[in-house]
A protein has these predicted regions:
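Low-complexity, Ser/Thr/Pro/Gly-enriched N-terminal "stalk/linker" regions
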Residues: 12, 25-88, 117-118, 122-139, ...
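Aromatic- and histidine-enriched alpha-helix N-cap/loop-to-helix transition segments
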Residues: 84-98, 150-161, 213-223, 271-282, ...
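Carbohydrate-binding/catalytic loop surfaces
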Residues: 53-85, 132-152, 200-220, 258-285, ...
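Elongated scaffolding segments in large macromolecular assemblies
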Residues: 174-311, 315-320
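N-terminal export signals
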Residues: 5-25
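Terminal, non-catalytic domain-edge segments
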Residues: 25-46, 171-173, 279-432
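Hydrophobic core segments within long, regular secondary-structure runs in both alpha-
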Residues: 32-44, 97, 113-127, 160, ...
């Protein structure tokens, strides 16, 4: 992707006076604060289920076509749980807590504190629904317990981030911290026992890993080690963390510290800010926790590099056409279930799911437009907001402000606009 230079602006993101421009269509909201109020209201009206877990998609009234307990047990539409409404609960809850907690810090309201705790309870539930220790589920069916047998590192990484954010927020009570610590310790022990792989239910055993020589893997593992040192007080975790920083490998052979310093890289698609943001969020936590000035500077460099790369995705928001009549369908069964077959390995489940999503996209083309032009630039905006360099943030305030103001959130079907709120709460008070 060609790098794009975004124009500077002398207007702050949160000032409410970003100019109306015609490039890429009219802006729906008069200011960013109004846009965020609507986004927040829609998230809580339609996308937070009865168990405090974000669902992936619903209709404009909030109706969700949930998989049944029987479908979850049978691995329908697929054993991964991909492309149905409870696909990404752990991921989205964990990441959205960044916004929920920053909102609470600003308002100190009981209502916002209650929303934070509701999201945390959702995360803890997803760690309590299986007999497999350390399992973090994606979401729950109508009975509040049935689930798909495989999670992933993309689910478990945000689970750690969200719980750490609450633990370190000043909102959590001592009793809540004790409870969080128990979940964190048990889950980490299970992951370590599997060689830093994520536990999954039979017949799969495991799926996804924090082990590997790549920015995303290296940073997630380092973050969990540092987190464990903080929440347990066990000095051996700090020692393991320090040793891990100097472990080298990959192509080219770099230390994990060097991978962190280099920032995120795209590797499985032209852009995938929406999944890479997990590691960038973990890197921000590492930057905040780290006291060694040299290492902290390296983490800041990784955050800067990630923000610069992510900013290239911001113009994608201009390609979303709200007037496009592309159909949304929540009927994933009619498209995906004709292809269903039993799966006994992770690869069989992946192959099935990839075929199914192509079929789903044919009856619900709105899925693709929101994924490409809402999900991706919104996640990119959050990545930019995580950068501690105010110069980088100021450079991209205009583009992020436009992104936030473009959309009528009451007309979006997928929850992945939530990242605009995470970005706004971090950037709204940045001086020009």
């Amino acid at each position: 992707m060609k790098r794009r230079t975004l124009l500077r602006s002398s207007v702050a993101l949160g000032s409410g006076i970003l100019p109306r421009l015609s490039i890429g269509g009219e802006l729906f909201h008069p200011d960013s604060a109004t846009a965020i109020d609507q986004a927040h209201a829609e998230l809580w009206r339609r996308f937070v289920d009865g168990y405090g877990i974000l669902v992936d998609f619903c209709d404009l009234e909030g109706k969700v076509n949930l998989p049944t307990p029987e479908e979850c047990r049978a691995g329908k539409p697929n054993a991964l749980g991909w492309f149905q409404p409870i696909e990404n609960g752990a991921m989205f809850n964990g990441l959205y807590l960044d916004a929920a907690l920053n909102r609470w810090r600003a308002t100190k309201s009981e209502e916002d504190a209650a929303k934070v705790r509701r999201l945390v309870e959702g995360l803890l539930l997803l760690n309590s629904i299986s007999n497999v220790k350390g399992f973090v589920g994606r979401g729950v069916s109508t009975n509040g317990r049935s689930h798909y047998p495989m999670g992933s590192d993309d689910q478990t990484g945000p689970w750690f981030i969200g719980l750490w954010r609450f633990y370190d927020s000043g909102l959590a009570t001592d009793e809540e911290k004790d409870r969080l610590r128990r979940h964190l310790v048990e889950t980490t022990a299970a992951i370590v026992s599997l060689g830093w792989n994520m536990p999954a239910e039979a017949p799969f055993g495991k799926r996804g890993t924090f082990e590997g020589f790549h920015f995303e893997k290296a940073v997630r593992k380092l973050f969990v080690m540092k987190l464990m040192a903080h929440v347990t007080g066990d000095t051996s975790w700090e020692e393991r963390y320090r040793a891990e920083l100097e472990t080298a490998g990959g192509e080219p052979a770099l230390t994990k510290r060097q991978y962190a310093t280099g920032g995120m890289r795209y590797f499985y698609a032209p852009t995938h800010a929406w999944t890479s943001c997990v590691a960038v969020g973990a890197l921000r936590c590492l930057w905040e926790m780290e006291e060694d000035s040299s290492l902290k500077a390296d983490y800041a460099a990784g955050l800067r590099a990630s923000a610069i790369l992510a900013a290239e995705c911001l113009p994608l928001a201009e390609k979303f056409d709200p007037a496009n009549p592309a159909t949304f369908s929540g009927d994933w069964r009619s498209a995906m279930m004709p292809l269903w077959k039993e799966q006994t390995t992770e690869q069989e489940a992946v192959d099935l799911a990839i075929a199914q999503v192509k079929a789903f996209g044919k009856i619900s083309p709105r899925r693709n437009s929101e994924a490409n032009f809402i999900r991706e630039p919104s996640a990119a905006a959050w990545i930019v907001s995580l950068c501690p360099d105010p110069r980088i943030l100021r450079d991209h305030l205009p583009a992020i402000g436009r992104l936030i103001r473009r959309h009528d959130y009451a007309r979006l079907h997928y929850v992945t606009f939530f990242w605009v709120e995470t970005a706004w709460w971090r950037m709204k008070d940045i001086p020009v």
